């Protein structure tokens, strides 16, 4: 297949790939037979959705997609012990990770327990002092004062710390990759255990917790007792799923779609307060979960107090919610300032290493709370898997982020097994690691080799998939609303990207923090407003008035300002329009 619009190398060095003739034919038939907008039909066809599947895809229902919780190993013993502790009034502790998934998972349990008239102790370790996951001193202290400890979003590899919880039962609800053996405890419910053969590995921890609560409610119903309303808690599952970059496919897509509906009702004081502080005055989307609310919930665990996010998500008190939201917002501002310095240093260091399969950087004094975000930025900038490590004395603690098709979690897990890391683990798109300073070069060299075997760092122009060609006059709010029926969009479910051909630049200016605001004309009365985030110093800055005609590509969105809704393009790429 030739390059779409003959763009074999764009301003950002990419080759444009558009729909095939067969995809065009199928989309035409789907649009006609299912009475869909052609752009929506093409979006569905490009994602492998046939006409028979389209109705179910456009209206995903949990009752059709939610799996039986008991398909997960150890779910039965976990539900038995959890419900037993609740009904006997035993002392329960929740040990959670300090990120959004951990906080939302903890908030799910705390909310459900509160609706059942029970309370639980929340424990979230300090990122710097204790690190990720259960540790022996904390587990021993909790075991001395509790009958049951539920570890969420952590614990699968915590053999020693869980053994230290003598005197208390332990349940693990997790989704990180498991090892060859499991901790000795009541249950390890994890779709990514090595002995799991199901297709639920894409669930985040909050999704696993939700399934436990579904099973608990089912058992309560069998006993003639109504359980708490789980549908009202789907806002937490949606937030965790998007913020943890879990694939928005299958049941995850239904969980997020319904969770966004619940969130729009503003029934959870913490999320309502956070939305107000973030000036989010429209119905939330998956984008808002990942880039507006998620970072603020995460900020406490990154640079502040680890339990702030979970407390915000769990509280029923509007006054407490407001106070916590203000603290988290302040921490998020601090996080941005810290992140900017680390990012500049990491980008320069990685650039100096050249173009290998892995982009990595390490530095003394870097804040461990921001290395994950900086790794994500480095991955986006280089389109390669990235690792960023904060060094402190002889030890480095880092985060890894990957690109589609390259399993960073498996590679990190293998490095730990080979002794090149003190510890490490994660999932396909993200992982964490701890490494000795003197082993760092060897570890990164080995990781680079493992990732290269998966195709990381392949040379040549990168492909930019496009879902079709539109005219500026077609970019209306009703078209965007139609396309959004294929959402929510996110990991493994990207929003459709369209091209617009042969346009001139009518206006360009820099806005905000280095963003480009551009207006395009097509010479036939059509105009398209666009924004290119962070592009003021990049190749797209060549889009200047009077600089010629261009093909452009990006994602359409509705921009709401002072009650007025307009369409704008999130501009991702452009190329000179070659006249024939």
Language-model-detected regions and their locations in the chain:
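Histidine-centered active-site/metal-ligand motif
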Residues: 175-176, 191, 367, 427, ...
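A residue-level signal for conserved active-site and pocket-lining positions in enzyme catalytic cores
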Residues: 44, 150, 298, 483, ...
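Short alpha-helical basic/polar micro-motif
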Residues: 207, 372, 376, 552
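Structural signal for conserved beta-strand scaffold positions within catalytic alpha/beta enzyme cores
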Residues: 18, 124, 172, 188-190, ...
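Hydrophobic helix-and-loop "lid/oligomerization" segment in the mid-to-C-terminal part
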Residues: 19-25, 29-147, 167-168, 218-439, ...
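Conserved phosphate-handling catalytic cores of large alpha/beta enzymes
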Residues: 138-246, 412
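Mid-to-C-terminal polyanion-binding domains and interfaces
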Residues: 4, 9, 84, 88-91, ...
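N-terminal amphipathic/basic leader segments beginning at the initiator methionine
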Residues: 1-23
